Amino acid sequence: MSSRLPIGVVLGSVGVDVRWWLDSARRLDAAGYAGVWSWDHFVSRGVRTDPVLEAWTTLTAAAMATERVTVGTFVANVMNRHPAVLARMAAMLQEASGGRLVLGIGIGGHPAEHEAYGIDFPPAPERARHLEEAVTVIRALWTGGPVTRPSDLYPLRDAYAYPVPNPAPPILIGAGTPAGVRLAARIGDGWAAEDDTFERLVPLYGEALDAAGRERAGQRVVLGFGGRRKRGADPLAAEPLLVAPREELARWRDLGADDLLLTARTTDDVDALVDAAERW
């Protein structure tokens, strides 16, 4: 790849081991991809005994194993961790990575996982309330504190949080519904979108930014492809973004995306990505 294109890769974290994940991250970094991203799950939706990599420890190891790529969550589940703890984890990863973290965060969507782990999973509107307050808590703690705020969800009292991340990581709101997109426009530094809903929702995102009095130029829209593609399905080598990346990138940018993410679940997928980068 002659120069880094804004194309990153979500590396599957289900049914793989951490050595594969880190080796893949190193290969993609060397090939010139812009970032490596992780899902945030604890349990497989398929075979329950499949290994599932924890997102934040995996990304921290990846930051140590790479030199240039962004590391990010696509996306963290707000219900999985108290936002004060998440703020501290993200701040440390931002420092460890030399400022390469992007925090994507959303309301989650795997209720069986929550039931298995005893983690609350209220209805979507209530999870959205958790998300909005969590973003407020995270940003407040990233100032270093002290932070005191009464709350029925996440109260804080004289909370300090050092070291302060500098710069603070951008926070992308994962959303695939109209309500989620409106929330992303109102509180996010950008929107983490998926290809199956993006074209339908992107006009609403622009309208919601206008309604919130926010400029589109200050936002980052990251669009993920293939998140629902089954492991071992159609080969990634046939993905249009790999065949004609600049043309496809221009097309999706015209539609409103800034960065594009492909999903790789297997060594064959990573091989296809590396081979494609050598041709560009």
Model-derived features with residue positions:
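Active-site-adjacent structural elements that line small-molecule/cofactor binding pockets in enzymes
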Residues: 1-280
